[in-house]
Design a protein with these regions (language model features):
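Residues at the C-termini of beta-strands that transition into short coil/loop
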Residues: 2, 29-32, 52, 132, ...
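Short beta->alpha connector loops
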Residues: 5-6, 30-33, 55, 80-82, ...
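Conserved phosphate-coordination/catalytic loops
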Residues: 3, 57, 163
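N-terminal glycine-/serine-/threonine-rich beta1-alpha1-beta2 phosphate-ribose binding loop
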Residues: 22-24, 29-70
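Donor/substrate-binding cores of folate-linked one-carbon enzymes
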Residues: 9, 15, 23, 74-178
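Active-site-proximal loop->helix
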Residues: 16, 38-43, 117-118
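N-terminal Rossmann-like dinucleotide-binding module
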Residues: 1-36
């Protein structure tokens, strides 16, 4: 599931091409018709679907129908900027993971890097966790901690954390399936 640039998706696609990677990406779903990540779906010939998020019920109903039709059993949220309902999550209990650009449980939600810098944290990082009905609150699978540099900006921090996300997401998937 994606909403934007798809850089974590691109990393997962590249890693999934390795014969040792434990999952195959069989479908990409987006709520944003302009999500740059959909270009990766086209480039790597991966089926994709776009469903408008005019209502969460409409979006989730269509997603569940498509996921069941394709017999997809595990979901990765990669920059998906919507909150899934309890009902949807219940259909995939401990089968949905997400990556978040902070060391959860700190700095849930949006604007993480700004909040981290405003709070004068010494460290930040990223977290892969199971999705639960509460925002960014599911059981933690893996985390990567990085030191915040002197004179760090939101943009430099965002780039550095994203680089770690690309590595951590695949490591987390491997740890789940091995």
């Amino acid at each position: 599931f994606i909403s934007g640039s798809g850089s974590n998706l691109k990393s997962l696609i590249k890693n999934s091409r390795n014969y040792n990677f434990p999952i195959k990406i069989n479908l990409i779903i987006s709520n944003n018709t302009n999500a740059y990540g959909l270009k990766y779906a086209k480039k790597y010939n991966i089926p994709y679907k776009f469903y408008s998020y005019k209502s969460r019920n409409f979006f989730e109903r269509n997603c569940l129908k498509e996921l069941k039709k394709r017999k997809i059993k595990f979901l990765c949220l990669a920059g998906f900027m919507k909150v899934l309902s309890k009902y949807f999550i219940k259909n995939f209990r401990y089968k949905i993971i997400n990556i978040h650009p902070s060391l959860l449980p700190k700095f849930k939600g949006l604007d993480t890097h700004r909040k981290v810098l405003e709070n004068k944290e010494k460290y930040t990082g990223c977290t892969v966790h199971y999705v639960s009905s509460k925002l960014d609150s599911g059981n933690i699978i893996l985390q990567k901690k990085i030191l915040i540099r002197k004179n760090e900006t939101v943009n430099t921090l965002k780039k550095r954390v994203l680089k770690q996300e690309h590595k951590l997401y695949s490591k987390a998937i491997i740890s789940i399936f091995r």
